[in-house]
Amino acid sequence: MSEALKVLGEHIANAQDAAVTGWSIANGELTVEIHRDRIETVLTWLRDDPACRFTTLIDICGVDYPQRAERFEVVYHLLSMHQNHRIRVKLSTDEEAPVPTVIPVYPVADWFEREAFDMYGIVFADHPDLRRLLTDYGFEGYPLRKDFPLTGYVEVRWDEEEKRVVYEPVELVQEYRDFDFMSPWEGAKYILPGDEKAEG
């Protein structure tokens, strides 16, 4: 299988040399990295080329690397049922530069792109309906970014008296938790189950 993926990787890199910035095979999977502005051209070619025939877009997902100048990777997972291959196509972008939509190539990309926008704030140029998909209408921020606080910015709940949804500052009540902050190196006064060494 890896020999077939190697041949496929070379074929893609040679045919799309202006767009491909690199490719690799790891854990039996081919990953092709491309320039952001060439995504629609490359995916159209991957779909239509007789040696590829990647007719199914399985998923689009985002990855956040805050330390990079182009902090986001957009990852396209493709399937060729004809060739029995799966590949991953990646591109990098930042918070400002829009990624061209691939809805003309794969109509199923519509909701995948909306999810990436909603979770990461990745903007897809020429998307027909780029609005939030999974979060609330007035949601602030992008929850899958690494710099988003784990608790969020506000707490949302239904107020029975007002008969509406209300937004309040986050309040973490943890009275039920009993934290034992003693370091195990300072010597515990009790023996943990299964710790036979502590008895001797």
Curated annotation (Swiss-Prot):
E.C. number(s) listed in UniProt: 7.1.1.-
Superkingdom, taxonomy of origin: Bacteria
One MF annotation (Gene Ontology) recorded for this entry: NADH dehydrogenase (ubiquinone) activity
InterPro entries associated with the record: NADH_DH_suC, NADH_quin_OxRdtase_su_C/D-like, NADH_UbQ_OxRdtase_30kDa_su, NADH_UbQ_OxRdtase_CS
GO (cellular component) term, any one: plasma membrane
Keywords, alphabetical: Cell inner membrane, Cell membrane, Membrane, NAD, Quinone, Translocase, Transport, Ubiquinone
Annotated Pfam families: Complex1_30kDa
Entry membrane topology: Peripheral membrane protein
Primary location group: membrane
Recorded family membership: Belongs to the complex I 30 kDa subunit family.
Function recorded in the entry: NDH-1 shuttles electrons from NADH, via FMN and iron-sulfur (Fe-S) centers, to quinones in the respiratory chain. The immediate electron acceptor for the enzyme in this species is believed to be ubiquinone. Couples the redox reaction to proton translocation (for every two electrons transferred, four hydrogen ions are translocated across the cytoplasmic membrane), and thus conserves the redox energy in a proton gradient.
Protein name as annotated: NADH-quinone oxidoreductase subunit C
